[in-house]
Amino acid sequence: MMKRDTKEQIAQEIAEKFQKSQGFYFTEFQGLDVQKMSQLRLEFRKAGIEYRVVKNTLIKKALKDAADVDKLAAGLKNTTAVAFAYDDPIAPAKIIKKFSKDNEALKFKMASIDGQVFGSDSLPQLSEMLSKTENIGRLAGLLNNMVASVPMVMNAVMRNLVSVIDQVGKLEK
C-alpha cells in the first residue's frame, strides 16, 4: 500500500502531465498480457507519447482543478492507463484504434484535447483527423498553389486585355 505522501506526489506529477499535454486519452487495458502491453507502450513511445497506468483515485485527485472534472471522472472505472500527447494530440487516437483492432482487450474510454472532452464513441472521428503538422503542410501547399497561380491569372488578364484592344482596333478600321 502506498503512503499518503507518495500518493500526493504521484497525483501532483500526473496533474502536471495533464497541464503540459495537448491531449490525453484514457484507456482500459484489462486482459492485455505483458507482451501486448509492452508492444503498445513501444508504439506510443515511437510517437513521442507517454503511456502510464495510474490508479483512478490518483487521476481524480490530479484532475480536481480541471474544468470538466465531472465528465472526465465519470469515465474512470476499472483499470485505467493514460496516454499523454505532448506534440500531436491526435496521434494516440490513431495508435489506439490500430492496436485495438487486433487486441479487443484495449478499450478507449475518453479523451481530452485542448480542453474539449471526447467520449468513448468518438475514437473513429478522432483517429481520422489530421495532425497539426499535416494541417500545416496542407495549408502551406494551398498557399503555395495560390501564389503560383497569381502570375498565371495576371497573364491571362493581360492576354484578354490585349485581345480586346486588338478586336476594338479591327472594328474601328
From Swiss-Prot:
Belongs to the universal ribosomal protein uL10 family. Part of the ribosomal stalk of the 50S ribosomal subunit. The N-terminus interacts with L11 and the large rRNA to form the base of the stalk. The C-terminus forms an elongated spine to which L12 dimers bind in a sequential fashion forming a multimeric L10(L12)X complex. InterPro entries: Ribosomal_uL10, Ribosomal_uL10-like_sf, Ribosomal_uL10_bac, Ribosomal_uL10_bac_type, Ribosomal_uL10_CS_bac. It comes from the Bacteria. This is Large ribosomal subunit protein uL10. SUPFAM superfamilies: Ribosomal protein L10-like. It comes from Chlorobaculum tepidum (strain ATCC 49652 / DSM 12025 / NBRC 103806 / TLS). GO terms for biological process: translation. Keywords: Ribonucleoprotein, Ribosomal protein, RNA-binding, rRNA-binding. Disulfide bonds: none annotated. Forms part of the ribosomal stalk, playing a central role in the interaction of the ribosome with GTP-bound translation factors. GO terms for molecular function: large ribosomal subunit rRNA binding; structural constituent of ribosome. Gene3D superfamilies: 3.30.70.1730, 6.10.250.290. GO terms for cellular component: large ribosomal subunit. NCBIfam families: PRK00099.1-1.
